[in-house]
Amino acid sequence: MNKIYSIKYSAATGGLIAVSELAKKVTCKTNRKISAALLSLAVISYTNIIYAANMDISKAWARDYLDLAQNKGVFQPGSTHVKIKLKDGTDFSFPALPVPDFSSATANGAATSIGGAYAVTVAHNAKNKSSANYQTYGSTQYTQINRMTTGNDFSIQRLNKYVVETRGADTSFNYNENNQNIIDRYGVDVGNGKKEIIGFRVGSGNTTFSGIKTSQTYQADLLSASLFHITNLRANTVGGNKVEYENDSYFTNLTTNGDSGSGVYVFDNKEDKWVLLGTTHGIIGNGKTQKTYVTPFDSKTTNELKQLFIQNVNIDNNTATIGGGKITIGNTTQDIEKNKNDQNKDLVFSGGGKISLKENLDLGYGGFIFDKNKKYTVSAEGNNNVTFKGAGIDIGKGSTVDWNIKYASNDALHKIGEGSLNVI
């Protein structure tokens, strides 16, 4: 009997595949078990690149920008009172905050996982499909299959599978508070009774260095980190309000072309955790100093897309029989629904009980979601040798799912959630 936490099963290899070591928040429980001058940052030809500088290595070492983004060295998630040696031998102290976990950033930095099969980026990344339509977490590539965008350059994406390599960034930042409340909740004491909101960004973009002569290169999987302080919570720019920030003067990593969509994080003092403020939209600057603009996370649009992929199924400790495109519980039968794009939805089970498959079930981009603190059994009706294929399985905290179904030969079972999956 297998107990799986966040892992995937490959029918091709006939075994469990461990998630990447980059997945800092994932554990496994198994025995086998602004103006016209505002520039969006989509990748363009090198002849049109505005900013030749990225990492300022006149004071800090290049490795520190890279190590922070990849949570290596002294930058382990949760580490506090972190210091680095500058080139002149003096110490640079980072803010008195725990180091963020950046595993929610896709390998090229252009999008951020927010859990399940969802990720966020900026809408204008659609012009460059390689930047956000295909996302790699750990060693697994995911594909965008649906999205919603806003006029404020926000984009929420549905991916083809549940992302197992990370739990995703927390999206509880409350942009609807007034400015003072936001500063009080997310600010850091910088002395003289003053608070500033300090945060981090992780992206790729055109990698260059100030202080030395190098050619420019766009290396999509070369992630580096920025340290910044917010200067304007409601900068009125093209499309709507953006958050404006400036880079730290010592640990300076300017935003460049290719950084569009990269995640921006601030610390929630009330909940004692890092949260996603939004995604990188654009820049204004002269090559030495710059202001970066961030599109705030849009919970309303995110929930609208999620609703397109939800079909609620209340079993209530009974048996749900699935076959012929229908779900039958007692004397009640409902169709397995699809959204307006003819895509299968997630079947969201509640109440505990048994799920019996009469035939092979291919949910396409939909998966199984189980509520908290319940017991479920998934098996074939009779002795049928049936298979399951879909986006994955999401098991709520405190729930246990006994799974006695084979996997389709061309699929991998992605399991997420804090509950237990027992593969029989």
Predicted regions and their residues:
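Bacterial Sec-dependent N-terminal signal peptides
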Residues: M1-L38, Y46-Y51
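Acidic glycine-/aspartate-rich tracts in secreted/extracellular proteins
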Residues: A23-K24, H124-K127, N160-E165, S204-T208, ...
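C-terminal subregion of chymotrypsin/trypsin-like serine protease catalytic domains
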Residues: A53-I84, A111, G115, A119, ...
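Conserved catalytic-core segment of clan PA serine endopeptidases
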Residues: D56-Y65, V120, K127-G191
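Catalytic histidine site
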Residues: T80, K85-S139
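Chymotrypsin/trypsin-fold serine protease catalytic domain
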Residues: F154-G258
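Acidic Gly/Asp/Thr-rich repetitive segments characteristic of extracellular carbohydrate-active
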Residues: N317-V348
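Extracellular, surface-exposed repeat architectures
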Residues: G351-I424
